[in-house]
Curated annotation (Swiss-Prot):
GO cellular component terms, semicolon-separated: chloroplast thylakoid membrane
Molecular function GO terms recorded: NADH dehydrogenase (ubiquinone) activity; quinone binding
GN (gene name): ndhG
Domain of life: Eukaryota
Transmembrane residue ranges: 10-30, 32-52, 61-81, 93-115, 152-172
Subunit relationships: NDH is composed of at least 16 different subunits, 5 of which are encoded in the nucleus.
Chief location of this protein within or outside the cell: plastid
Protein name in the entry: NAD(P)H-quinone oxidoreductase subunit 6, chloroplastic
Length: 177
C-alpha cells in the first residue's frame, strides 16, 4: 500500500505489537483453544504485513492456507481433545521447559546479533537489481518465484519455521495420548 510515512509507521508498530502480544498469548495461555485463536490472530497480522509491503498474493495465500486451513485444523484438533486429561497432566514447570527456554533464549540472542551485524545496504542493492530483471519476465508465476526467493525470502522462511514448530507440537501432543 502506498501510505504516508507516519500512517505507515503507525500501522507497522501496531501490527508488530499485536504480533508480539499474540505470540505471547500462544505461549503463555494455558487453555489450548485460546492459544489456537491467538495463533490465528498472529497469522492474520502477518498477512497484513504482507499487504503493507505490496505482496498481495503472498498475503492471500497465507490467509487461505495458514489461517483458513491449518489454524482451523489446529482448532478442530484441540476441540476433540479430552480437556480433563490435558489439565490433570499439566505441570507448571518441568526440566524440559527449562532446557527449551535456554535454547530459545540463545537462539533469540544469536538472531539479534546477526541482525545487528548484517550489512543491509547490500541486501537493498540486490533487490533493486532484481527489479530490473522483473521487467523481462513474462509470466506472473516467474515474478512470484523471483519475489519469493529474493524480496520475501525471510518472511517465507519464518512462516515455514512456524509451521514446522506447529507440526512438531502436534506430533508431541498426539504421542502424549
Amino acid at each position: 500500500m502506498d501510505l504516508l510515512g507516519p500512517i505507515h509507521d503507525i500501522l507497522l508498530v501496531s501490527l508488530g505489537s499485536g504480533i508480539i502480544l499474540g505470540s505471547l498469548g500462544v505461549v503463555l495461555l494455558t487453555n489450548p483453544i485460546y492459544s489456537a485463536f491467538s495463533s490465528g490472530l498472529v497469522l492474520v497480522r502477518i498477512s497484513l504485513f504482507h499487504i503493507l509491503s505490496n505482496s498481495y498474493f503472498v498475503a492471500a495465500a497465507q490467509l487461505l492456507i495458514y489461517v483458513g486451513a491449518i489454524n482451523v485444523l489446529i482448532i478442530f484438533a484441540v476441540m476433540f481433545m479430552n480437556g480433563s486429561e490435558y489439565y490433570n497432566n499439566f505441570h507448571l514447570w518441568t526440566v524440559g521447559d527449562g532446557i527449551s527456554s535456554v535454547v530459545c533464549t540463545s537462539i533469540l540472542f544469536s538472531l539479534i546479533a546477526t541482525i545487528l551485524d548484517t550489512s543491509w545496504y547490500g541486501i537493498i542493492w540486490t533487490t533493486r537489481s532484481n527489479q530490473i530483471i522483473e521487467q523481462d519476465l513474462t509470466s506472473n508465476v516467474q515474478q512470484i518465484g523471483i519475489h519469493l526467493s529474493t524480496d520475501f525470502f525471510l518472511p517465507f522462511e519464518l512462516i515455514s519455521i512456524i509451521l514446522l514448530v506447529a507440526l512438531v507440537g502436534a506430533i508431541a501432543m498426539a504421542r502424549a495420548e
